[in-house]
């Protein structure tokens, strides 16, 4: 959409993830995201959620974001991931949540966003969500947290998974929305293969890929893509590991920014959509060498990509190359001491009319961390120096991280942490100059980096009751968090052009530093597994209360094209509570599943409270002439968003499973941001084959 494309590639360098039995996440789960080394979940010093395997495998998910949105405290707004209301709506330009695939960033170098349908969903083994500022570990874009997808590693025995699925869009409740005559659907064919060969399984191989097609529920908006991933690992002995990974991806897609009207919410403004054809090729190499208690890891990744615009009148084509190199040294000492240190270099070059020509960027970092573990407690201290330069304009900042964990008694774990965060604006945020229909996207080259900190205090209680037929295993977790940002960047709608007359071309979006902000809140999560007679029952739940507020609501942070001073108070639709725009105060998730004799019945619930504050200009009578229906939609959809999903699976044989599902079974309308309606109810069917 508008050429704000997201391209990425994947490198695999971590060992295979370990999850609790029967797909439910309990205290024996290990994670790598918290400290960049394997660690028991209950011993982490920060909040890390691990999605149960059943959310990945038991649901007929068309896209990986359907999995991600089940994580407690995580929301997706128009494809942008947010954690604990740390971000608003950014149109795919810039992200405060870093997306990792096997420990390497999966954000585009130009826009800093993610294209979810290119994620390796068929080979995802574990999804870890680290919450809070994580820049000391992972650098810029981890200001609000990390979502880490860990994929298959070469297996000692042959492992195969093949699936084909189709998902059909139902007609919406409002008849005028359903513009189509024939059924609309999306479908996918996926495969994943893993095995090892040779003496002592020296040679390991993983192959996986997908063909995907989406006819879309919006008029003229669809997506067709194909991708292939190959991973080779060579381990001649216990000390040395080398590997190569390649990826190719092609996508042919259309998108739309603004609706025609609320009652025509699935028809783009002026019945027009932007069309983009994207190509990517990437190659990654890694080397790991263990020398006694020391581990050396080198990763090098090269990528080339191209975006071809489908419009002559609005050329947003772009192309670029990127090089990523990182060295990590780890020293696992005696008496529970671990040392980590490393260096990072990322260089990118791109050229596009969308960004007003050619640009180059460089990112360098030095980082170090000390971890200490004893019988009942763990301590962690990390420091990172980060430097960015775009077209010769440089910025640098150190960030610090402190964390501690203490086991009060068996099953009871306390944690506390404080961490700084830092994010440099993406090239798209600084230089994008394009159009979405009659609306414009305006450049903002003078914006500054944003920084902040997060503090958290949490407790996790494990529950394990044995000796009865039912049994019980589970956990409860509570966390209080406090986050503050300086010079927070927000995507803002307003009048930024000065063409003569009253024209919509003067209005659009730009990125602005809006001053200091604060987010405080409480998060409760839990999971359990038990038996009711012969029926196995397992479930998870999460509730997040986040209060995001502006600390200087009257402070002027910009002026529009008419010279009018802009502040939080003057630009907000509802400034009465100082709530930041495009945020949810309440967010809840739940999933429950029952299994018996090859049958599995499950249900998921997702809830967001009403988005109380947006840019006031969206409801201005003048703008309503050009972008109608925003005020009407907010009046009609003012009770929040509640989605209830169901699934039914039948194991046909030892290796074949038939899965049926309904997403948004109540067929509720939702507007995740102004002038956009979420998809209606969908009904899916999937046939899967699995070996080992």
Per-segment meaning from a language model:
Residues 163, 373-376, 481-484, 508-617, ...:
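Gram-negative outer-membrane beta-barrel transporters
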Residues 108-110, 123-125, 136-148, 153-218, ...:
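Outer-membrane beta-barrel translocator/receptor signature
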Residues 293, 297-309, 415, 448-512, ...:
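Membrane-embedded beta-barrel scaffold of Gram-negative outer-membrane proteins
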Residues 65-104:
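Extracytoplasmic beta-strand/coil segments of soluble accessory domains associated
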Residues 104-133:
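Short acidic/polar hinge/loop motifs at secondary-structure boundaries
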Residues 14-55:
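Short, acidic, small-residue-rich periplasmic hinge/interaction motif at the N-terminus
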